[in-house]
């Protein structure tokens, strides 16, 4: 039996498992590194030749819990504390 189609039926071991950072089944068990996000590297794996992949994972594709409020706060000068007294 060669390494082609018939041999694929005999494969039953998992080389990849779930990644703690991106959640995909791309974490290589023996290498201990994720083929999708590059975990445990500090920086997320990203390449210019994968333009569509960049588009899927870039800022703005998620909830942006913090970032979506920044522009409004910037417009008001990042106000902090209590309301100022009205001058009469």
Swiss-Prot record:
Component of the ribosome, a large ribonucleoprotein complex responsible for the synthesis of proteins in the cell. The small ribosomal subunit (SSU) binds messenger RNAs (mRNAs) and translates the encoded message by selecting cognate aminoacyl-transfer RNA (tRNA) molecules. The large subunit (LSU) contains the ribosomal catalytic site termed the peptidyl transferase center (PTC), which catalyzes the formation of peptide bonds, thereby polymerizing the amino acids delivered by tRNAs into a polypeptide chain. Its cofactor is Zn(2+). Zn(2+) binds at residues 19, 22, 34, 37. One of its GO terms (cellular component) is cytosolic large ribosomal subunit. PROSITE patterns: RIBOSOMAL_L37E. Component of the large ribosomal subunit (LSU). Mature yeast ribosomes consist of a small (40S) and a large (60S) subunit. The 40S small subunit contains 1 molecule of ribosomal RNA (18S rRNA) and 33 different proteins (encoded by 57 genes). The large 60S subunit contains 3 rRNA molecules (25S, 5.8S and 5S rRNA) and 46 different proteins (encoded by 81 genes). Belongs to the eukaryotic ribosomal protein eL37 family. Keywords: Cytoplasm, Metal-binding, Ribonucleoprotein, Ribosomal protein, RNA-binding, rRNA-binding, Zinc, Zinc-finger. One of its GO terms (biological process) is cytoplasmic translation. NCBIfam families: PRK04179.1. It is found in: Cytoplasm. Binds 1 zinc ion per subunit. This is Large ribosomal subunit protein eL37A. Present with 21800 molecules/cell in log phase SD medium. There are 2 genes for eL37 in yeast. The lineage of its organism: Eukaryota, Fungi, Dikarya, Ascomycota, Saccharomycotina. It comes from the Eukaryota. A zinc finger (C4-type) spans 19-37. GO terms for molecular function: RNA binding; rRNA binding; structural constituent of ribosome; zinc ion binding.
